[in-house]
Regions:
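Conserved C-terminal "lid"/linker of ANL adenylate-forming enzymes
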Residues: 343-345, 392-403, 424-493
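Conserved ATP-binding/catalytic segment of the ANL
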Residues: 253, 259-319
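C-terminal boundary motif of the adenylate-forming
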Residues: 255, 298, 316, 337-364, ...
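Active-site loops of AMP-binding adenylate-forming
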Residues: 45, 212-216, 224-242, 279-282, ...
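Conserved AMP-binding/adenylation subdomain of ANL enzymes
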Residues: 49-68, 75-182, 192
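Conserved pre-ATP/AMP-binding loop-to-beta segment of ANL
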Residues: 5-30, 37, 62-68
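Adenylate-forming
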Residues: 272, 306-333, 365-417, 437-439, ...
């Protein structure tokens, strides 16, 4: 392939450029449609180019030389277009296109082949990478684990000792620690990765700290298809609870904030969509007369200008008592207290109190993406701490092993009582961090298998499909709300 234009090709390019106006539609993006039919977002040439340039300018302090990235997200996802196609064009990156089943269990295999220097991922992707790193550590020798523990402490301290929260000073201890953890990073294909982005949902502070301790800084961001992609990016790794500051060229405001300063996040700038294709009514609902795009996300701005995401308006749980509760905060706290839990889904709309559906971490079939009955190493280790030596979910829950034709409704889930007590203790700890009494979880249920794309609980970008999950497990939810069901989490905490 020629690396330079000959006169004829250049003339052809000029001719095509003259046929295109900056305000014409360049890209159609389908929204995820987790609560209904997807809408089609129209993005103009100007919106796309502006967003790429704003992103590029904002990440200036970080490495911007040509590198390697890997495309594995569905290309109808705006983040995939931005970080796996368009940004690489601007930076001159080499792009590896992953196996079509990368998100069904083959992600690590593809990362090992591509060896990217930068990567974009949704939180669940980083959770899976973290799990693989923990497995690699656990399977290493005692000396390696000892050195790794020291190295992670040094690396985390190196990042947090740096006042601006950017790249740490390259002291001798930092360099030695970095070399120690490089072995584990290489095992998951991130041996060369210098910069990672996280979007789609907030990445937990716990996960961010773990990746910093492995010398893998992850920059959180906030954006939307309707906003042309990214709108905020973390420029300081020390801001673990935020999604960063607003990018250059973007305006943000919090609409109708409550007493805590939380309200709907609204955005304005050149990146905003033209509208929804053939849906003028929804367009006017999204973009007001002053040009503000209403994101549907709830959050607040801290005094240092960082944006903090609380959750989605459509996911807000409104209890029978009229309390508006963002479930994401509660779910993240629960997962932080219970390392054996892969998914936590809070339920309580129009109910007197909150309950939570939990799944224990199990292995996933790389070929089909379906959950195995075998428990993940994190779960096995957690069970051993309870003096339980079972290695299968069916044994822990006393149900038949999962198969593609599995129907849990014919089974009664009776978890091991030691497990019930330990989960209750974890939820009690999480409840101590509740922002109000109404935000305390009072009952829980362990579900018969992990959430996956093939079983329907996760969408194509690995987001939980709340409405689908609540419908699928409606009988379990109703059982939790029966008065005869024991209150596992007491009101008097």
């Amino acid at each position: 392939m020629s690396l330079s234009f000959d006169p004829q090709l250049r003339q052809e390019l000029f001719f095509k450029e003259k046929q295109i106006a900056a305000n014409q539609c360049a890209l159609l993006i389908f929204t995820s449609g987790t609560t209904g039919l997807p809408k089609v977002v129209m993005l103009s040439h100007d919106a796309i180019v502006s967003n790429i340039k704003f992103c590029y300018a904002t990440v200036g302090p970080f490495r911007r030389e040509p590198g390697v990235t890997m495309s594995y997200l569905p290309l109808n996802h705006v983040a995939a277009q931005l970080f796996e196609v368009l940004m690489p064009l601007l930076c001159g990156d080499c792009v590896y296109f992953a196996d079509r089943d990368a998100l069904k269990g083959k992600l690590i295999k593809n990362l090992r082949i591509a060896q990217p220097t930068r990567l974009f991922g949704v939180p669940r992707v980083y959770e899976k990478i973290q799990e693989e790193l923990l497995v690699a550590e656990a399977n290493s020798s005692y000396l390696c684990r000892l050195l790794s523990s020291w190295a992670k402490r040094v690396l985390l301290k190196s990042y947090f000792c740096n006042a601006d929260g950017l790249e740490p000073k390259r002291t001798l201890s930092y360099i030695c620690a970095s070399l120690i953890v490089r072995k584990f990073k290489a095992q998951v294909g991130l041996g060369r990765c210098a910069y990672l982005w996280a979007g789609g949902a907030p990445l937990s502070a716990q996960a961010k700290k773990y990746f910093l301790s492995m010398d893998i800084p992850v920059a959180d961001m906030f954006g939307a298809s309707e906003a042309g992609g990214a709108m905020t990016i973390t420029r300081s790794y020390c801001h673990l609870e935020s999604s960063g500051r607003v990018m250059l060229g973007i305006e943000v405001k919090i609409d109708k904030p409550n007493e805590q300063g939380q309200g709907e996040i609204c955005l304005r700038g050149r990146c905003i969509m033209m509208g929804y294709l053939n849906n003028e009514e929804k367009t006017h609902e999204c973009i007001d007369s002053d040009g503000w795009m209403h994101s549907g996300d709830v959050g607040h701005l801290s005094t240092d200008g960082c944006l903090h995401i609380t959750g989605r308006i459509k996911d807000i749980v409104i209890t029978a008592g009229g309390e508006n509760i963002p479930p994401l905060y509660i779910e993240n706290r629960i997962k932080a207290e219970l390392p054996c839990v892969s998914n936590a889904l809070v339920v309580g709309d129009k109910r007197k109190f909150l309950v939570v559906l939990l799944t224990l971490k199990t292995d996933i079939d790389n070929a089909t993406g379906l959950p195995f009955d075998t428990l993940h190493l994190d779960t096995v280790s957690w069970l051993k701490s309870l003096d339980i030596h079972q290695t299968r979910l069916s044994e822990v829950l006393n149900i038949p092993a999962f198969t593609p034709s599995f129907d849990y409704k014919g089974s009664v889930i009776k978890p091991n009582q030691k497990v019930v007590a330990a989960v209750e203790a974890g939820l009690t700890r999480a409840n101590k961090n509740a922002l109000s009494r109404a935000q305390r979880v009072q009952k829980f249920a362990l579900l018969p298998h992990d959430f996956t794309v093939p079983t329907g609980e996760l969408g194509p970008t690995l987001k939980s499909r709340r409405a689908f999950i609540c419908e699928k497990y409606a009988d379990i939810i109703e059982e939790l709300y029966k008065e005869s069901s024991r209150l596992l989490i007491k009101n008097d905490l």
